[in-house]
Regions:
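Face-selective signature of the C-terminal outer-membrane beta-barrel domain
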Residues: 1-90, 106, 163-166, 224-230
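Outer membrane beta-barrel strand-and-loop segments of large Gram-negative receptors
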Residues: 4-12, 48-61, 140, 144, ...
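Residues on the lipid-exposed face of transmembrane beta-strands in outer-membrane beta-barrel proteins
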Residues: 7-13, 60-66, 101-105, 153-157, ...
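Outer-membrane beta-barrel channels and translocator barrels
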Residues: 14-18, 68-71, 106-110, 148, ...
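Transmembrane beta-strands of outer-membrane beta-barrel pores
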Residues: 15-17, 26-32, 56, 68-70, ...
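Surface-exposed extracellular loop regions of Gram-negative outer-membrane beta-barrel proteins
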Residues: 32-39, 105, 109-151, 171-196, ...
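Gram-negative outer-membrane beta-barrel transporters
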Residues: 67-73, 171-173, 194-285
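C-terminal beta-signal and adjacent terminal beta-strands/loops
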Residues: 175, 227, 277-301, 316-320, ...
Length: 396
């Protein structure tokens, strides 16, 4: 359970083309957690503890905004500093200075350029900060703030509010990310299948990076057809420390594509369609040998991943098409609308990695307890069906 008490003081003033905002914040966080957990690494272990954390956070921030007289140029410069009393590595404001800068300039009436850069800090999860070992000791006190340096730059071309084309490139660099000492996987790379994240021994040594380019266009044709599309090409990687090699992160889908259009028909009818496509995410195969051990399976009742082959496999690309039809009635003082929405009209199947499960039957009951194994089976994970929706909208 988390409970926050926050105090924030802020002042904003303006002078001609300048706007200045400065302030300070003081937060007190109470975190409580009662854990009973069985894990199996090389042998079975049990963690049974109660945690209470009372953390005092403090910070300073300031931003200066400037807009030129002709409004062609805008700039924003900011600085923030954060600290807390949880651990020695987190107590100094100067260790968590977060500068940020954004610029925008209209080169012509139709073409504009923009860019931004910033450094941001974030606390590790409270589940990790409050984790205790079998001797009831907080063992992650050495954790520090996570940081991300972010850069982006782009161009935008617009014509008569009828057509807009934007291209933007970005780069993000992550540092001091908590990594699991047991399996060497950063917490940010652990997806939903991992359950609770952070309740283990951690070290702030992992690094990550993501970079890519995004293209966006909007087109309004004859006030009837409205088209919009975007495609993002990117790469997401991580490494456990500075000496190791980068490998694919859990979010490395490579590309995301969307296109949608709406056509306005006579008598207040409209028809819309959307097509979405996303690249397959990488995944880690199971460690069948470890998972089949009776002592290992009984410790957590789910399979174990083969971290020596982390994210070596990749899921299939998934695409989906949706259609929506609207009919609108404009009455004297209100608007009444009816629509039918058909999601996934092709009934495309989203295929996930097969799940490894125990049958509950021991294959070698005559073996010693530590060597007994379950017979295992796999269950396919395919989802996706046509989903119709009928709706009514009313505005007064």
């Amino acid at each position: 359970m988390e409970q926050d008490t926050k105090l924030r003081l802020e002042n904003t003033s303006s002078f001609r083309n300048w706007k200045i905002n400065i302030g300070a914040n003081l937060n007190y966080t109470q975190y409580t957690n009662t854990t009973f957990q069985r894990v199996f690494i090389r042998s079975g272990q049990t963690y049974d503890y109660h945690t209470y954390l009372g953390i005092l956070h403090w910070g300073l921030f300031g931003t200066i905004n400037y807009t030129s007289q002709d409004e062609r140029f805008t700039a924003s410069l900011g600085l923030r500093a954060d600290a807390n009393n949880h651990a020695a590595a987190m107590k100094q404001l100067s260790d968590q200075l977060s500068p940020r800068l954004s610029l925008s300039y209209r080169l012509t009436e139709q073409l504009s350029a923009s860019g931004s850069a910033g450094l941001y800090y974030q606390l590790p999860p409270y589940t990790g900060m409050g984790f205790k070992d079998s001797h009831d000791r907080l063992i992650n006190k050495q954790l520090s703030y996570m940081s991300v340096s972010q850069f982006s730059a782009g161009l935008s071309w617009q014509k008569n509010n009828m057509f807009e084309l934007t291209v933007e490139g970005f780069y993000k660099d992550y540092n001091k990310v908590p990594v699991s000492i047991a399996d060497g996987i950063p917490l940010t790379c652990k997806g939903n299948e991992y359950g609770v994240v952070g309740n283990e021994a951690l070290a702030s040594t992992a690094q990550g990076r993501s970079y890519g380019v995004e293209l966006l266009f909007k087109w309004l044709i004859a006030q009837k057809l409205n088209l919009a599309s975007s495609i993002t090409l990117f790469k997401s990687e991580y490494r456990t420390n500075k000496e190791s090699e980068y490998i694919n992160s859990a979010w490395d889908n490579r590309f995301i594509f969307n296109v949608r259009g709406t056509y306005n028909l006579p008598r207040n009818w409209s028809v819309g369609m959307k097509i979405s496509c996303i690249g397959g995410a990488p995944y880690t195969p199971y460690d069948v040998d470890k998972s089949s051990l009776v002592t290992a399976w009984d410790a957590q009742a789910k399979p174990y991943y083969d971290y020596s082959r982390y994210n070596e496999e990749r899921l299939s690309t998934f695409a989906q098409a949706d259609i929506r039809i609207d009919k609108t009635f404009y009455l004297k003082h209100c608007m009444l609308g009816f629509y039918i929405d058909l999601q996934n009209i092709t009934a495309s199947k989203l295929k996930q990695a097969d799940v490894l499960m125990s049958t509950g039957v021991i294959a070698n009951p005559e073996a010693p307890q530590a060597e007994r194994r379950y017979n295992m089976k796999t269950i396919k994970q395919d989802s996706g069906t046509l989903l119709p929706t009928l709706g009514i909208t009313f505005e007064y």
